[in-house]
């Protein structure tokens, strides 16, 4: 893997989402203009199996809020993407000036690590070759759901893609686990630790407690 510091973008992955298991919890996050408090999404086999938040006193209202603004009335959604946004300067500015709800989604998603539920970012474009800025082809454009378009396109897409960004101060670690069991940390205690990524931490270290 490589995290190019010259880019205010993100490093992303969409493969093997059937193996996604666990709970996604964020104490507070804006999804567009909608604020979610204590958002929790449970995943089994790469799909949402339970969900909750604490915006309202009523559990039914909280469920409806998620169904209206994340699930978009699907019974469940798959994991569409995991990416690590590297624009820590934008993250700091959003926190300092309390403008997280004003950021366009293509900026907000690049401020930190995020999961997306729904379709991948290559929806309806999987068959077109896509390249990184360094000229290398992006080959992981499909997954077990989007590939269904070759037989029945109605089973391949959900027509939604919602990015949920995790604040750095809520991160323990993001770690690569290889097939042989060896590991490499990318983020540890809310800071980038891959050699060469130290400049990404400067805006984070400059934030007021």
Where do the language-model regions lie?
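Long, well-ordered mid-to-C-terminal structural blocks that present hydrophobic/aromatic surfaces
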Residues: 17-73
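Dual-mode signal for accessory low-complexity, basic/Gly-rich regions
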Residues: 50-122, 126
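Residues that cap or initiate secondary-structure elements
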Residues: 30-32, 47, 88, 121, ...
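Charged, compositionally biased interaction regions
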Residues: 92-209
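Single conserved hydrophobic/aromatic residue that forms the stacking wall/gate
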Residues: 1-9, 13-14
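Active-site lining segments that contact anionic ligands and/or coordinate catalytic metals
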Residues: 19-21, 36-38, 45, 77-81, ...
